[in-house]
Structure formats: structure tokens, C-alpha cells
Amino acid sequence: MKFFFNILSICAISSSFGAFKAVGNELDEVICNAMKGMQAKEEKKIPYNIGDYELIGITVDCKKKALITEKKHIQYSLSDFSEDYKINAIKNWEKANCKNMIFNTNTGWSTTQIIQDTDKNVVLKLKANFETCSQ
């Protein structure tokens, strides 16, 4: 999870420097380039453990303005995840990502994390973007 916060920090810094000069598509290009650079760096390490999870995928889709990460729990099956887990995960995801200017301003960019169980069944799909962050 720490790597993801580093990703968002890099993107925030890159876009804040570029925001003074960039307008519209230029800002998208700055964000895209920052995320693509981070993706290339992180892909070299995949898969790797993050606490109880293994990071198994990271994708940046500049046309859709989306950052997607996938992680798999190293012990839990689908039935092992409680409702409290899902509620807390959603709150934590939004709280962490809505602090980032890429997702809390109307840039059109979103971040999604797909959480899977040990058998790669989807447990939860978390998303943060301007719409969720402005509620």
C-alpha cells in the first residue's frame, strides 16, 4: 500500500509543477506521463507482497484517464472477508485518495483498486474520482 501512496505523491507533485503551464490536454499529458513512469517502475517488481496482500497488477489507461491496481489476499478466501472489511476498505480508500489533487479536482482521472481472494475471485472494487471525492 505504501507504494501506492508514493504513486499518488509523485503524480501530485508532477501535476502541481505542470499545472501552472498545463491546461486541459496538457495537464492530462503531465498526469499520464507521471503515471506511466510509475507503472514502468512498479511493474518490474510485480508480484510483491504488501502486508497481507500481493500486488499482482498495475495498469495506466491514459485514454480512459484511469489508474488500476490489483492485489490478491495471500490467505483469505471470498467467504473470509466480512462486511466490516468492505465498509472500512471503501472508507480508507476514499480517504487516502481523495486527498490527491488528481482525484479531488475535476481532471477526469480515477483510481481503481481490485481486491481479490486467494483464488483470484473479486472481493471488492474500490474507486476514487472527482465524483466520489466531492460527495
Regions found by a protein language model. Name each.
Residues 15, 41-45, 97-101:
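Solvent-exposed amphipathic alpha-helical surface segments
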Residues 28, 37-66, 72-76, 104-135:
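Polar/charged, Gly/Pro-rich intrinsically disordered segments
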Residues 17-31:
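Cleaved targeting-peptide boundary
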Residues 1-20:
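Classical Sec-dependent N-terminal signal peptides that target proteins to the secretory pathway
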